[in-house]
Amino acid sequence: MTVYLHDVNRGLGVFLLVVSFLLPGCSSSGGRRASVPVMVDATAQVVEQARQTWLQEHPNWGFHGRAAISQGRDGGSVRVEWEQHGRGYRIVLSAPMSRQSWVLSGSSSGPARLEGVGGWVRVGEVAEQVLFEATGWQVPMGLLPDWVRGRNSGGGDVQLDAEGRPHRVYQRGWQLRFLDWFPSSVGRPVLPRQIEASRGSARIRLIVDQWDELIP
């Protein structure tokens, strides 16, 4: 990705941000077409930088939400309860229709543990692989902690919206779109409300119903 940042009008503090990346095409080759320039003014840049700083300074967080996950013609919906304490996580997934539930826990620097109904347990070094072997779902567990909060980890190609927030992200073969945001509140910046991710035939749509700030 090449990012060109030109000073369009120093007096007005307006900048032209051109993020050169390719969007998925309609062909099977997955070709991309160049994006259009996005105008991001100086005020929006300052606000977004403050938001990114806030995210870095608040590593303990959680949310309640819903997710629709599909792999080709197969898929399902789950309730999601996510708790993140620094690098450690505990995620409860429950599927009301099938009455199944799973608890995925671990750390980004250690093994992952998945517990299911009936007491069975799977343990592995990579959370994404552990979850896939048990459910058949492709979920980028290593990327989600940053994605769900709209945090720029610096590891992908990013297109910003007019507010300077991430709008589309391309990372490790995944395409992510931010569809809606919660407005800022006292002591908390804007946070994603709805995101959608896809890679090949895998699709994930996440809706956050409530954000929680966890006590260290």
Curated annotation (Swiss-Prot):
Name the InterPro entries on file.
Answer: LolA/LolB/LppX, OM_lipoprot_LolB
Gene Ontology cellular component annotations, sorted alphabetically: cell outer membrane
Q: Record's Pfam families?
A: LolB
Query: What keywords does the record list, in alphabetical order?
Result: Cell outer membrane, Chaperone, Lipoprotein, Membrane, Palmitate, Protein transport, Signal, Transport
Protein's membrane topology:
Lipid-anchor
Biological process terms in GO annotation: lipoprotein localization to outer membrane; protein transport
Indicate the secretion signal residues. 1-25
Q: Where is the lipid attached (N-palmitoyl cysteine)?
A: C26
Could you tell me where this protein is found in the cell? Answer: Cell outer membrane
Q: Where is the lipid attached (S-diacylglycerol cysteine)?
A: C26
Role description: Plays a critical role in the incorporation of lipoproteins in the outer membrane after they are released by the LolA protein.
Give the protein family: Belongs to the LolB family.
Q: How does it assemble?
A: Monomer.
This protein's name = Outer-membrane lipoprotein LolB
Q: Which organism is it from?
A: Xylella fastidiosa (strain 9a5c)
Taxonomic placement: Bacteria, Pseudomonadati, Pseudomonadota, Gammaproteobacteria, Lysobacterales
